Structure formats: structure tokens, C-alpha cells
Amino acid sequence: MKTNADLTTKPKPAGKSFLRKHSLGLGALAIVVTLVVAYMRADPATHLGSFFGNAIADWTGVLVTVIMTKHLYERGSAESKQPKGKLRSPILEFLRGHSLTVFLVITWIGWAYLFRRMDTGSRWGQVVGNLVSEWTQILGLVWMTKILIEVGSKEGAR
């Protein structure tokens, strides 16, 4: 016979699935892929084609923000998690503490280099130009969250 304790004990919830744990990143990735496919089929000279090209850069920025802010750090930013512990090498500690900026700067240089070598008026040249702009905005926002505050945000609570 079951006791009252047995009847009131809730079963342990099952572990969250991969899809549940990563649904935001996967959702953003699905949107980027959908936009790339739509852009490949659209005429970039039309409003709709132009929209798809611009949206690729915007949503790639969302994807990078979701994924990279989960795994990388930016010391001094209230919006970023802070690294635990300290590394022995001051150089490695600096790179880890600013790994989000390091990643964004390196990939920004890559996008800028690619853009410089492309025809800016070509289909993908416009998209890559928008990606350079998007990366500049993300990097600027990361740095601004280290210095500036906004009432009601995490920075404003400092």
C-alpha cells in the first residue's frame, strides 16, 4: 500500500531535449537558411529580393549573438557571463576575458576582406556589405554595454 509521502512525491522531470535546450539558436539558424534559399531564388533587383539579402545579414547577426554570447565572454559587460577562475597566463586570461570581442574583430576582418574583394553591386556583394555593417553594430553594442548604462537594464542596476 502507498503512503501519503509516496502519493505526493512528484516524479523527476525528464532531462530537456537537445531541441528544447537549443531552440533559440536552431530557430535563428532555420531563419537564416530560409532567407538564403529565398534570396537565391529571388531577383535581387526587386524589393523582395533586396529584403531577403538585407535580412540575411540581420538574422546572421541574431544567430551570432545568440550562439557566441552563450560560449564567449566580455569582461566588464553586464550582458555577458563572466569567466570562472583565472588562467595562469595573463595573455590567455585577457583573450578569454575578451573572447567575444576577439571573435567579432577576427570575423569582422574576414567579412571586410571578403567584401573588399567583391563587386559591391553584385548579388552577394550587397549581402556581405550588410554583414560587415551588422558585425560593426554588434561589436559596437558589446563595447557600449561595457561603458554606457540604460535605466531598467542590467547595466543600470550596477
Task: Please describe what each predicted stretch is.
Residues 3, 156-158:
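Short, charged juxtamembrane terminal tails flanking transmembrane helices
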Residues 12-13, 28-45, 105-121:
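Polytopic alpha-helical membrane-helix bundles and their juxtamembrane interface segments
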Residues 23-27, 59-63, 99-103, 135:
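Alpha-helical transmembrane segments
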Residues 14-25, 93-99:
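N-terminal membrane topogenic signal
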Residues 1-17:
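Short, Lys/Arg-rich, polar N-terminal cytosolic tail immediately upstream
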Residues 88-107:
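Transmembrane alpha-helical segments of multi-pass membrane proteins
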Residues 73-87:
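Membrane-helix interface/capping segments
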Residues 39-41, 45-71, 78, 113-150, ...:
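A structural feature that tracks compact, well-ordered secondary-structure segments
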